[in-house]
């Protein structure tokens, strides 16, 4: 299906637009609400069997109805590919250093990767999550609430200590509320996590940098390279942003008060590579989500995914996947 056809499909266009996590100057509250959309979409896909996550139920509203647009198979397949790709990169990084490595997730939302890693006996030195304080305070309440089939606190190496209602410290796990655009605040909050700047550290950002100005995101990347001895970065965000598909996405997000301030960096693989190399990363690999789906991820799993909800045609899925990418960079 071509860009014009996708643009006229308001259901799919709105679904793609509203499921994203990000940081926006224009309306932070609207941006933070997209975390709820993403969590419900993931929960729906997991219930359908796209992947296993025993922990998402602690954060999702099981009684809420997922909007019709976000029940499209293409949406669930996209979330699966995104989740699987990020996890594969992180697991590979941790295994490379036999667990003597740290993970820092920017714009974490209600992500559950920490618990999925620990439950599978993956070794890691420390896992830090960062988001707006309004998001982390909610996540803390979900983590600490009694009842439920899974006790998230059992994954912590020490008793959870909460400060300012928005920060949680528990040995191997830290959750802090900070605005990534505010350098001094971010550095102060990260300091409370006692990260080791001399051991390998992988940073994650899923549709986060695109909502910051290009100068702000570039400054963030440069600071990481200067402050950490062995940093790596896995970045998931929009791609090929000069067509009608992106204009429709921008329009839908704009109606929700969300602006894509860093969209210029998402135009091409060359732009992405230039951004990371200018920040000091030596190795930069960019793959769109079609490449991720058809080459990077386990093809037996891809075959299984295709069988869950059979698609009449693949053009729409391919079009959606072509407009998102994963960047993996390291020094």
From Swiss-Prot:
Catalytic reaction annotation: [phosphatase 2A protein]-C-terminal L-leucine + S-adenosyl-L-methionine = [phosphatase 2A protein]-C-terminal L-leucine methyl ester + S-adenosyl-L-homocysteine
Transmembrane annotation, as ranges: none
InterPro entries in the record: LCMT1 (IPR016651), Ppm1/Ppm2/Tcmp (IPR007213), SAM-dependent_MTases_sf (IPR029063)
GO molecular function: protein C-terminal leucine carboxyl O-methyltransferase activity
Domain of life from the UniProt record: Eukaryota
GO cellular component terms attached to this protein's record: cytosol
GO biological process terms held by the UniProt record: methylation; regulation of mitotic cell cycle spindle assembly checkpoint
Pfam families: LCM
PANTHER family: LEUCINE CARBOXYL METHYLTRANSFERASE, LEUCINE CARBOXYL METHYLTRANSFERASE 1
Protein name: Probable leucine carboxyl methyltransferase 1
Organism, scientific name: Caenorhabditis briggsae
Name of encoding gene: lcmt-1
